[in-house]
Amino acid sequence: MAKAVRMADIAQRLGISTVSVSKGLAGKEGVSAEMRAKILAVAEEMGYQPPARAHTQPGGESIGILVADRFFNENAFYSNLYRAVLKCAAEQDISVLMEIVLPQAEKSCNMPSFLVNRKVDGLIFMGEISRRYLATAVQTGVPFMLLDFYDDAIAADCVLSDNTSGSYMMTEHLISTGRRNIGFVGSVLSTSSIMDRYLGYVKALLRAGLPIRDDWRLEDRDDRGLFIPFTLPHEMPEAFVCNCDEVAYNLVETLKRNGYRVPQDVAVTDSMGRMHGDAQFAG
């Protein structure tokens, strides 16, 4: 039996991305009319057959959610995000299947059965996942979107917080209270969200003419995305902007164990505007 032609095969023939092929076949924006014509011509030449539309029940639709294991532990943010998606789906009479992607599955790009067998009409990636895994999933041709992250190398619809502006405003608020030495907590290269929050922090400091010191940027997680103990600098800043509330809480506990009062000695805030510690500081 001849092997089924995939979007990835068409993409390889034309030297373009699988996402572009998907858009061309679906008649979506993002590819030129000339390229769309080439995609359709090559698809016909190669005998491409679009997979049958998936339905879990007559008249119903389904979506799959993929989330990396490192994000779906005790992290209240992603638990709440998942519940919000479930609520919206239920209101639209859409069923939801979820797969927690374990580290080994992410590394080996092992796709869940509901995706391989096209048991879903669409896919949501919730929280950052490796580019290789994402690219492999895209090749299935199932429509997808990204939730709480983006990837510069993959054209996709995404839903995001305005991380840069939120962090900028929080850093600016700290500056307005008279603090001039401000650090940042977050492994900047770990996720697009942390990177954008760091950029907002840097922008605020640059505009105020304040120092940006490498020793005041604390790493909060390892290459696997797992939290690590903080290494406090020898010379402490007056405040820290943390990339999320969980990290802020962990930092407060670390500061207390090391004899610092929060916020009297060191103020701690997350990038979404929440202050942490025994008391709110005036601002």
Protein language model features and the residues they cover:
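Alpha-helical recognition/docking segments in bacterial nutrient-uptake
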Residues: M1-A2, G60-E172, F230-A239, E246
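Short beta-strand segments enriched in small/hydrophobic residues
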Residues: R13, K23, T56-N73, H173, ...
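Flexible loop/turn connectors
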Residues: I228-G283
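N-terminal helix-turn-helix DNA-binding module of bacterial transcription factors
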Residues: M1-P58
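Short acidic capping loops at alpha-helix termini that bridge into adjacent secondary structure
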Residues: R180-N181, I212-W216, V262-V268
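An alpha-beta-alpha
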Residues: Y168-L210
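Short beta-strand elements in bilobed, periplasmic/extracellular small-molecule ligand-binding domains
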Residues: A89-V101, Y198, V202-L226
